[in-house]
Curated annotation (Swiss-Prot):
GO terms for cellular component: cytoplasm; cytosol; nucleus; proteasome core complex, beta-subunit complex
Protein name: Proteasome subunit beta type-4
PROSITE patterns: PROTEASOME_BETA_1 (PS00854), PROTEASOME_BETA_2 (PS51476)
Organism: Dictyostelium discoideum
Domain of life: Eukaryota
Amino acid sequence: MSHEHVNFPVYGQVDYFKQQQPQQPQYNPHLGGKQKTLDPIVTGTSVIAIKYDKGVVMGSDMLLSYGSLARFNSTERMKKFGGYTIVGASGEYSDFQSITNTLNDLVTDDHCMDDGSKLSSEEIWNYLARVLYNQRNRGNPLWNTLVVMGYQGGKSFLGKVDLVGTCYKDDIITTGYGSHIALPLLRKARDENPNMNLEQAKQLIQDCLRVLFYRDARSSKKIQISVAGEEGIEISGPIELDTFHWNSGEAAVKNFSQV
């Protein structure tokens, strides 16, 4: 009876680690670079907005975080489009830059039509919902949650679109960590004062952003507030929130040091 020689793996002679490694992707210069990301890298946190009696107010901080590093602290996350609309964004900032370019092209094309009408806030909101849903179906979503607000023809508009194209309209909109912290505060204030004026709405937004600064590790106390109302649309300059005065504990520290 003949015995066939069988080669069994011998410890130390087989590189199991090398065999388990995935095949490395080969660079193809004809494919070009990837333009959009599947992983958020430089991100912004919450955007919050509420309707008041004659318009809409929206607020956000100006911090962009590189992972957990507070990297860029003076960046606008709200942009004007046309004469009636402001869009605020949380999430990946490079994707928001791509969306900004797309909307600027849309507004330019609409202006070139010269038909006497301008894009409304609701039309821009619907367009963004289709764009984000299309990118999601391609498996390459734009990693943003967008808040669209505007005022036209005596009517206020406030809507939201997320990274998979889900969209809805409401009187109060929040994104990010603000959906957990700021949303209950905004709802309570609106229930107590359903016809708040502009100054009350601005103060409410500032108070909510102050709470988010205390509770959200990705936020800052440098903020911007946008208004869409009878006098048009406006984005404020940087506002520094007055926060808790930590020197109030100096007396306790001095007493403790004497013990």
